[in-house]
From Swiss-Prot:
Binds 1 Mg(2+) ion per subunit. Its EC number is 3.5.4.19. This is Phosphoribosyl-AMP cyclohydrolase. It is found in: Cytoplasm. GO terms for cellular component: cytoplasm. Catalyzes the hydrolysis of the adenine ring of phosphoribosyl-AMP. Zn(2+) binds at C75, C92, C99.
């Protein structure tokens, strides 16, 4: 039986979050064993924040949750791709549909930002 290898990166694995219809990569985050299990059991994406050192469910503040459609692992079983239905307009905390809106062009990184919501309004603390 295949077991996910959480040891290579100190207990974490990269999780690539992809739109289940378009294939667009929405975000990349990290999971530990607990958050992967929470994701598999709840059908919503859960992650471990390295910055805040805590567990979080995608959309817990913004309402932009992700419904799990399919989960795959790679040949080394040390990362996962999670295909989701994005509930709400955006996956990125910046208000963009995807976290990948900065493109290498002409020798520099160029931002192609098109926020679908105002983060200052959504993340009031």
């Amino acid at each position: 039986m295949i077991q996910i290898d959480f040891q290579k990166m100190g207990g974490l694995i990269p999780a690539i979050i992809q739109d289940h219809e378009s294939g667009e990569v929405l975000m990349v985050a990290f999971m530990d064993e607990k958050t992967l299990n929470l994701t598999l059991e709840s059908g919503k994406t859960w992650f471990f924040s390295r910055t805040r050192n805590k567990y979080w469910m995608k959309g817990e503040e913004s309402g932009n949750t992700q419904e799990v459609i399919e989960v795959l692992t790679d040949c080394d079983a040390d990362s996962v791709v999670i295909k989701v239905k994005q509930n709400g307009p955006a996956a990125c905390h910046t208000g963009n549909r995807s976290c990948f809106y900065v493109r290498w062009e002409g020798g520099q990184w160029v931002e192609h930002s098109n926020p679908l919501f105002d983060p200052k309004e959504v993340y009031k603390k």
